[in-house]
Every structure is written in structure tokens, then in C-alpha cells.
Regions:
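Long, contiguous binding/interaction regions
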Residues: 1-26, 30, 48, 52, ...
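Glycine/charge-rich, flexible interdomain linkers and switch-proximal surface loops
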Residues: 23, 27-33, 69-86
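Short linear Ser/Thr-Pro motifs
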Residues: 33-34, 46
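Short amphipathic alpha-helical segments
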Residues: 36-38
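Short hydrophobic/aromatic beta-strand micro-patches
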Residues: 41-43
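Compact, glycine-rich, soluble single-domain proteins
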Residues: 49-66, 81
Length: 133
């Protein structure tokens, strides 16, 4: 992935992380499907958090003049899909994510690691390292 693409994806990822989405995975779908170039998959701990994450994503991206083509699933809050054309964001309640297992379904997709995700991983690792002391 190019630096331009990474910075664009970091905009989406930053929006996803704004309401503490968990288990964020970015899949390179370009070679596997014509639906989208990238899937961003994340989880929330409750249907209320799932909806808050989805709403926050829309607010943040709208400030950058990026609007979804379609939004589905907000009524139930179990699986919200935000279609931004080349990027599709799946926000799951964790039990639904486990059930549908998109991560496993698209196991052949490459994982994309952007600067924002690298920073997130480092922050998640830091408390674990302190626990070892």
C-alpha cells in the first residue's frame, strides 16, 4: 500500500477508533472481490456502542466531505455496515462478529497495517509489558 493510501485509510481508522472500537482488522479485498478495495472490521461491546461507533464514523468522515453510499443495520445494532464505495466498514457486536466470522471467510485477504494501526498495537502491547514487571 502506498503512503497516500495509508493516510486515507488512517482517516477511516481514526474515525473507527474514536468510540473505542475493538479488534480492528483492515483487509485488502482488491484482488478478491469487486465489491470494495478494503474492508475494515471492528467490534463493540454492546449494541449501543456499535451504533455509537457507526454514528461517530459518519460524523467524522462527513467533516472530510466523505459520505456513505449506504448504511445498514443501525436499528438492531448487531452489525452495522457502512458502504463508502472502495471502503466498507463492518461494525459488529462481538457475538455477531464471532458468528459471521468475516475474518475467517476472507482469510485469503491480506492484512493492511497502517501507521494508526501500528500505533494502536504498540499502545495495546505497552500495558501487557508493564504487567510482566
Amino acid at each position: 500500500m502506498s503512503t497516500d493510501t495509508d493516510s486515507e485509510l488512517d482517516l477511516y481508522i481514526g474515525a473507527v477508533l474514536g468510540k473505542k472500537a475493538e479488534n480492528v482488522v483492515v483487509l485488502d479485498m482488491a484482488e478478491l472481490t469487486s465489491i470494495a478495495d478494503v474492508f475494515i472490521i471492528c467490534s463493540g461491546k454492546s449494541n449501543r456502542q456499535v451504533n455509537a461507533i457507526a454514528e461517530h464514523i459518519q460524523v467524522v468522515l462527513k467533516k472530510h466531505k466523505i459520505k456513505p453510499l449506504s448504511v445498514e443495520g443501525t436499528k438492531e445494532g448487531h452489525w452495522v455496515l457502512l458502504d463508502y464505495g472502495h471502503v466498507i466498514i463492518h461494525v459488529f457486536y462481538q457475538a455477531m462478529r464471532d458468528f459471521y466470522d468475516l475474518d475467517g471467510l476472507w482469510v485469503d485477504a491480506g492484512r493492511i497495517m497502517t501507521p494508526a494501526l501500528k500505533k494502536l498495537q504498540a499502545e495495546e502491547k505497552a500495558p501487557e509489558e508493564n504487567d510482566d514487571m
